[in-house]
Amino acid sequence: MNKEHLTIYAYDWRVNSVEREIYHTSDRKSKDFELHLRVYGVNERGETTCVLMNKVTTSILLEFPDNYDVETNWSRVRMELMSAIFCSTDKTDKNVVMVKKQPLYGARHDKYFCKVSFSSDIGKRAFVMRVNGTVDRGSAATANRKGGKIHQPMKFPNGLTGDMIKIHGIDVPTELQVLEELDIPPCGWIETHNAYKCATITKRFTHQYRANVKTFKYCTRMECIPPVLKTMAWDIEARIHDISSPGLHIDDEIYMMSVSVSDGKDYLLTLGPVSNEDKIRFDEDTDIKVYQTEERLLLGFSELCRKLSVVARMGWNSSRFDCKVLLARANRLNCINSVLDLGMNPPGKISTNSGRTFGPIGDYEPIYIDTEGVVCLDVMEMFKSTYTKLPKFSLQYVSEVFLNEMAIITRTPLDMVHHQKQQRRVYNLMYSECLRQNIAFQDNMFNSKKVVTNDDVVGYSGAYVKDPVPGIHRRVGSLDVNSMYPTLIIAYNLCYTTVINYDDETPYKDEDFEVIEWEDHIGCEHNPIVVEFESLKKILYPKLQQNNTPSKRSPKGDGVVSNFFLPRNNKRCITNENDDVDEDEDQDILNMVTRTKQPSIEEQRATIRYKLLKARISAMSGKRVCETQRLKVLKSSVRPGILPNVVNKLLVERKRIRNIASVPGDPVEKALLDKRQLAYKITANSIYGATGASNGKLPCKNVAKAITALGRKVIKESIQMASDKGIPVIYGDTDSMYVQLSDDLEDPWHYLQSLGDEITSNLRKPMRIESEDNISDVLFLGKKSYICRKLLKDGGISEKLDYHGGIAVRRDHSGFVKSTHNKVVHAIFADVSLQNVKHVIFEECLKLMRRKIPIDELTKTSEVKSIGDGFTLKPSMKNTTTLNSWKLGDYTVKKHPQHDTLSKEYLKRYYLEQLPAHVQLEHKLMERGRSAVEGGRVEYLMVKRPGSKKSSASNIEEITYFKENSSIIQINELHYILQLVKPITKVCEAVWERSDIVVDAIKPICAYSKVLDEMNTKLYTPLVL
């Protein structure tokens, strides 16, 4: 065979262990395993190419106890370790070596580790099992239950046993180790001069080669040339009887599937009453294929996917609906293996978004079909998570621009970038940096496989929030600490290798450290929030008993105005679902409106403050911390940390790319550069979250605590500096603050930047305060929730109101509530009086009572989650205080006392009545013969029926059914009016610190509605003689 020069854009890397036979003599042979690496990519012409790589190895790192002299005992230790190696070809001295590395955790000097290399993943797992004495990290009980062999820990010289050795790098993917060894990107152009073309090539890709993995290198000449990627989008149409378990019902059916390819070709596969499967030409770019049975339709889709040979497959909500329906129907029709075969190398497999391909999959857990050579993407998941700021969400745009850049930056294969989120990206990035700096990658320091509960987590205070000053504020400027958490890491040298507890032993001197000290008070009597909350409780609830037991509901006419937060005697069991049709809540509001005695303004303001403080105490999750915390941080002059180095590279590269993008040039190139800088920003901001995640892959709570404490210090000092200059600070939150500007400023932009520069001069480099926005008018509703009108740089004022958080961005409110809320907000920003605001509310309610509001404006939507099979219960892990709290699918219910003896049909009816009203409506619709709603959201109206009870389930109805039966069903106008109280009261509380404005506005309407209901009852109730 002749050697060829090969250049490909690699986007998918796959590793597997292959069994092989080893011939020792002519009459003796044995079996062993070796790793094969398959790389999928496209060449310069866009043709799909697969490269089979050999000579692949994987390795792990062994850490011995600090008090064990591994250097003295090395020869005997190596002998024992080699005896534990499974594959005979791996039992060589070069595969078991002693290396000197700096530990990742703690301020420590270099120490000796042992690096063990393997030619197969199977051999690596077997070695771990023999050394540690566990079955792949499982317990002895698990091994017995599964019929596995129990291995005792190995014994080493001088009393060392295998369970005392920490083994790192077990979960580092082999493909990542190969990429780092060769220093090539997981998604980009690579080349080799020693490729051999395979004699036999599968029809699923154009070219196939073999090559030694060590001959590949990064191709710099193709760095700026975008690849030609052929992609496809797909969608299914199906009849579903139960949206909670799509595709599982015997009468469910997929009747149509559509495919759109990036080259302009479209395909439509459908069921139809034809005698043969003829191909119908719709137009020159669309093919329609008709099938007689659902099974043939699914097989036709699988065959089409293999024939197209695309590099990526995209869908909308495909991981929660399309994939689940497709696999459920294929499983019922006994063609699951053929349907899974959608890639360039069979077979495909079902995988979750966490990368798990084994074990039971939850009813509501996103899944995808993992196929070699074809990246599976769900654009809806992109929209909901990482890519919410992208200007468009087409597959071609995301895969070619953003995902590629994120994969290159974080050293992560393309499919992991999308499916396994930031934890995996930071993990891969840290592994890459540790390898470069000869630092031991200690990913097994805290047994990250263990699930950390709330009781295991050591609490610490979160970010600082300065409560907003009530009212509409004119001429406000916002200052923001640019990339605060990443720059804090750099400024204070915060890292795994530098931050330690104050009392920890270290080989460094005390003068080599900087001490970070702060007070942490969470849920204790020293916390100002708790102190103020308890004082307000005594004022608002004077009848509380000495033992602090909760008081019962106050009678009508007494107590505070807003009783949304008062305890209920009949508290609902369902805790994980926002039920927008809660009749108890409506009754609470109605009682508040109709009470004869309203509290004073002082009581209202005390109540507003009480609600805010109660929400913050609830956010503490019952944690109690009362102590002075101290940490020591190694100075950067002594030893720079690895995290500051990583973050600094990301920020410097982002700044460089932004400077290049600011120069006028090709729009396509500018779009590419913009997504590159966005990828750097997201990655830098993710590092703080990775250190603080309790169940994370590389946790370091000391680093997270230090970052948060220093962040509070920075924003407090910045607020104080502005106040010392006589500039009022209206609101502050985490990394930003809003200051009051003078009306006579000629250039507010220059003034605000000058203020930011002055505050910056007191901060450590590279921290910087920048001016973010100049605001004409702003109303703060709470944390991360405000409404504003921005000031333009030409001196004008934006006509559009910007909503951040709150009702305007929520889907579960009706259009009537949203539009009324918006009209009230616009009236407030127009500086109308309090009485005029009441008039706006009254007029909108009057329109509703006169039936001048369109039905579509009254429609509400709520998400319907899974209820499983309707009767099987599981213990609720989140609500351990309630013994009678059980999980029915994704909902929490009370278990029937005779659950084990009653029939399944009775239990289904019993538990269905406990579920939210919109869930009951969804099942009612399916009983009427209507298909379930794709996407899991049901639309409904609030209605009232003659003689119906006040149960919420009987008082909501689907729109079409309402229109067909409007003569006997009426709109429940009072419900929609009462739904205005909460959101608009929140706005009025922020402006006037009063809670009775909406109540006063709707009180005549509520009284009128009550009279109408009484008249209808008297007129239409039959007389019994």
From Swiss-Prot:
Catalytic activity: DNA(n) + a 2'-deoxyribonucleoside 5'-triphosphate = DNA(n+1) + diphosphate
Keyword Nucleotidyltransferase: yes
The protein's Enzyme Commission number: 2.7.7.7
Alphabetized UniProt keyword annotations: DNA replication, DNA-binding, DNA-directed DNA polymerase, Nucleotidyltransferase, Transferase, Viral DNA replication
InterPro entries listed in its UniProt record: DNA-dir_DNA_pol_B, DNA-dir_DNA_pol_B_CS, DNA-dir_DNA_pol_B_exonuc, DNA-dir_DNA_pol_B_multi_dom, DNA/RNA_pol_sf, DNA_pol_B_thumb, DNA_pol_palm_dom_sf, DNA_pol_type-B
GO BP terms in the entry: DNA replication; viral DNA genome replication
PROSITE patterns: DNA_POLYMERASE_B
Superkingdom of the source species: Viruses
Enzyme category, top tier: transferase
Disulfide bond found in the keyword field: no
UniProt GO MF annotations: DNA binding; DNA-directed DNA polymerase activity; nucleotide binding
SMART domains xref list: POLBc
Function: Replicates the viral genome. Host DNA polymerases cannot substitute for the viral enzyme in this process.
PANTHER family: DNA POLYMERASE CATALYTIC SUBUNIT, DNA POLYMERASE DELTA CATALYTIC SUBUNIT
Family per similarity comment: Belongs to the DNA polymerase type-B family.
Name of the protein this chain belongs to: DNA polymerase
Organism: Trichoplusia ni ascovirus 2c (TnAV-2c)
